[in-house]
Amino acid sequence: MEKYKDKQLSAYERAAALADTLSTEEQAQQLKYDAPAIEKAGLPSYNWWNEGLHGVARAGTATVFPQAIALAAAFDKDMMYRVGEVISTEARAMYNSAAKHGDTDIYKGLTLWAPNINIFRDPRWGRGHETYGEDPYLTSRLGVNFVKGIQGEEEYLRAAACAKHFAVHSGPESLRHEFDARVSEKDMEETYLPAFKALVKEGRVEGVMGAYNRVNGEPSCASEKLMGKLREWGFDGYFVSDCWAIRDFHTTHKITDTAPQSAAMALKAGCDVNCGNTYLHILAALEEGLITKQDIRTACIHALRTRIRLGQLDDNEFDDLPFDIIACDGNKALSLEAAEKSMVLLHNDGILPLDKSRISSIAVIGPNADSRAALLGNYNGTPDRSVTFLEGIQDAFDGRVYYAEGCQLFRDRTQGLALPGDRYAEAVAACEAADVTVVCVGLDATLEGEEGDTGNEFASGDKPDLRLPEVQRVLLQKLKGTGKPLIIVLAAGSSVNTECEGNALINAWYPGQYGGKALAEILFGEVSPSGKLPVTFYKSADMLPDFTDYSMKNRTYRFCDDESNVLYPFGYGLTYSHFECGDVSYKDNTLAVNVTNTGSRSAEDVLQVYIKSENGVKNHSLCAFERVSLFDGESRTISINIPEGAFETVDDNGVRAVISGRYTLYAGFTQPTELSEKLYGGRCVSVEISI
């Protein structure tokens, strides 16, 4: 028996044995994202590029979950695990089916390039909705559970997750191929690295993807400093470049002169797989003496090790996962659950929930009312059925439903031959005819997304400001002017100031294929909203630091100088009931908090714990959270673990330590700030600890 077939050996030993049966040229070929077959071993050709951000993407029909930022708003670790589990199960079933029919093309593999765990430090960044928000602790907890769900706990990986984009990457999109992000050691350790460290050490993530930009002068895909962190953490998976990022070394970053030099720089630093074509020049780099045969062999072993862990050399427990598990009813039910938990009620004057017995007609208006794009975000699959906001309301309400588009998403007319504002009159008429109006505004992935991937002609995927497009602002003012009850539904993946709250404001994000059904359930009170903002919503971008400034000074809730520019704070969100915290105590790393549902209906809310010390971050940091479900009038003591790392502080050299002193733990259903407590209508409780 060939040594690489011996299942008693480790994946590394088997990969090394297989690599040693290949010539140097054959080893080099395995480092491309579209790797050829190794026929002698029965290993088929393989395309490393697949996506699974919130469902298997770009590969046909799949369950489409809410966008990543929406999943983060649920603050639900268990749900993240289950979402990851569904995504990888569907990916494996697709892989089995495609392989059976000889299809090993792009988006058919088992290496899912997700999650995106970059910190959403600036609300203008177009790709922020791919992330889990602005907080490193929240990002870490959700990311670890997502990775564990993706990869499974069986003998072989169900699929291989990939933490991206290592490690400091958040716009501007238009500059990403040439930009150098300058970051202090303190900010690096305190903000940008924790999620990656957690996914490597706790999640055992199989892949890490480097970013396009440089970090402190080094290209992310060939950074000795960053690669050293991975080695320090014990990373033993594969490292892949972002797509065509290595080409940027010589074309836009200008840190090398030729493609062979770029290939050599990345390979020697530890980049195993090249998404792109620069590794076609590896043999030229070898001939020029820029790399050694051992450099090629090492990367080849790492790549083959991942494929062996996926069971591609062996019969495994996933080989029989059937095609019919894709987009099955159970998977789609989880998508609905995620949408229900992720929507955030930002304002409610008492109009919600709507009483069907007291209204006979509803107007549903706006460019996102019947938009499927507003459900899906980016990096999405194709649902076999989706429910728009309009359709969800129509399905749930027996009375008259008026519909008017009102305006286009951002253009000033809906038809080329029409005059500007050609649908405002219809929208106002529908609003006047109805008892209540639900207006669906916001963005979609054509207005915020990835450079080269979106239709945003203004900012290469980034947002130029935090306002709605002008045509939508005009629409809102016209509807508000009728004096009729107005509920605003915002579909967006980032901070947007609607400049009008109406009688109620719901942030629906990009809620996945059943977003319309989830919205209707919330509007009519079948489900109490329970989402919380994983990012700060600002009034204006004018008071924010420069977009290209990667310092955390005056960024995010942890470092903002004051709340004068905050519209809705991180961690904020209302329910149809009201939860309060009472007695609180701390012992042996456990915080015990008595919580009571003082409202008139059962509901679920998110208990949040923040820590503050004189040596810590400027304000306070999230250090624990848990969803709590209570009947009306019910009280319960919630015991929540406080991780030891919560008490660590980071000095200017990026060194972590626990410093003796006094620490304050705050527990509540929002942040411990004046604005947060005012908006939520309740205060946090606190306990002081001496260390």
Residue map of PLM features:
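Glycoside hydrolase catalytic-domain context in secreted enzymes
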Residues: M1-Q671, S690-I691
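Short beta-strand elements
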Residues: E674-I691
